[in-house]
Amino acid sequence: MLVVEGLTCRFGSKAAVDGASFSVERGSFVGVIGRSGAGKSTLLRMLNRLAEPSEGRILFEGIDVTALQGRELRQWRARSAMIFQQFNLIGRLDVLTNVLMGRLSEVPSWRSLVQMWPEQDRALAISALDQFDMASYAAQRADQLSGGQQQRVAIARALVQQPDIVLADEPIASLDPRNTKIVMDALLRINKHFGITVLCNLHSLDLARSYCDRLIGMASGRVVFDGAPAALTDQIARELYDLEADEVLGTASHVPHGLPAPALAGVAVA
């Protein structure tokens, strides 16, 4: 279980995240929602320790993540794989090598420098690409792919880290509707098929309701909603987005055909 206790991140006098507290059961698909500047990205970066908390604690299976340093911190970053809005691929390298970068914490640095990856890691990378119909692009340069294809490569890279948690920071923000669905289906697959916990920052409530079994809503750095998608009221929607409710709440879409419907969690409004 992931437990967040009073997590705060300040930049000068401004709190980007202010006293966030929640817990996440293993195997959950949690959407973190709210308008731009609500603190969603900072929250996920703190969970991975790319951003340092000013106050509070992050616990995972009893381990104090906020106290980790050195090799233990690098291991945690491998266990909590990040997926970024801008993909963070190396364009001049081929797709397979980009995916193998997810194994850096497990191999000596000289192997990656001379591109001598162990055969078992290469097989793992090809298998991960195959999960998202990208194995045929293994030898192609990453910068020759579409945005949706690049994001699927980034998800495959996260998968080869063999993580406990995937932290997806606005993974579909720059994608068209078709590629948005492909990428969200890929995230749902690693959650349902591999049992990996997913925390995904999303701006769209319709997508969040379709794919997530739980929502954490943020406004001005604070958690103001934590519960099932069906429990998101007009009042909470207005607080999250500072808009009229009918501008942000639509009819919930269905989970993609062939994938199990998520179970609803309980509701707690902070």
UniProtKB/Swiss-Prot annotation:
* Domain (ABC transporter): residue spans on this chain: 2-245
Q: Which UniProt keywords apply?
A: ATP-binding, Cell inner membrane, Cell membrane, Membrane, Nucleotide-binding, Phosphonate transport, Translocase, Transport
Q: What's the catalysed reaction?
A: phosphonate(out) + ATP + H2O = phosphonate(in) + ADP + phosphate + H(+)
Q: Where in the cell is it found?
A: Cell inner membrane
Instruction: Give yes or no: UniProt keyword Translocase.
Output: yes
Q: Which InterPro entries does the annotation name?
A: AAA+_ATPase, ABC_transporter-like_ATP-bd, ABC_transporter-like_CS, ABC_transpr_PhnC, MetN_ABC_transporter-like, P-loop_NTPase
* Membrane-topology descriptor: Peripheral membrane protein
Question: Which class of enzymes does this protein belong to?
Answer: translocase
- Where do the annotations place ATP binding? 34-41
Top-rank taxon: Bacteria
* GO cellular component terms attached to this protein's record: plasma membrane
As one GO molecular function, the record gives: ABC-type phosphonate transporter activity
The EC number of this protein is 7.3.2.2
What SMART domains does the database record attribute to this sequence?
AAA
PANTHER family hit by this protein: AMINO ACID IMPORT ATP-BINDING PROTEIN, PHOSPHONATES IMPORT ATP-BINDING PROTEIN PHNC
Which family does the UniProt entry place this protein in? Belongs to the ABC transporter superfamily. Phosphonates importer (TC 3.A.1.9.1) family.
Provide the assembly information.
The complex is composed of two ATP-binding proteins (PhnC), two transmembrane proteins (PhnE) and a solute-binding protein (PhnD).
Which function does this protein serve?
A: Part of the ABC transporter complex PhnCDE involved in phosphonates import. Responsible for energy coupling to the transport system.
Name listed for the protein in its UniProt record = Phosphonates import ATP-binding protein PhnC 1
Q: Which organism is it from?
A: Rhodopseudomonas palustris (strain ATCC BAA-98 / CGA009)
Per the UniProt record, the lineage of the source organism begins with:
Bacteria, Pseudomonadati, Pseudomonadota, Alphaproteobacteria, Hyphomicrobiales
Underlying gene: phnC1
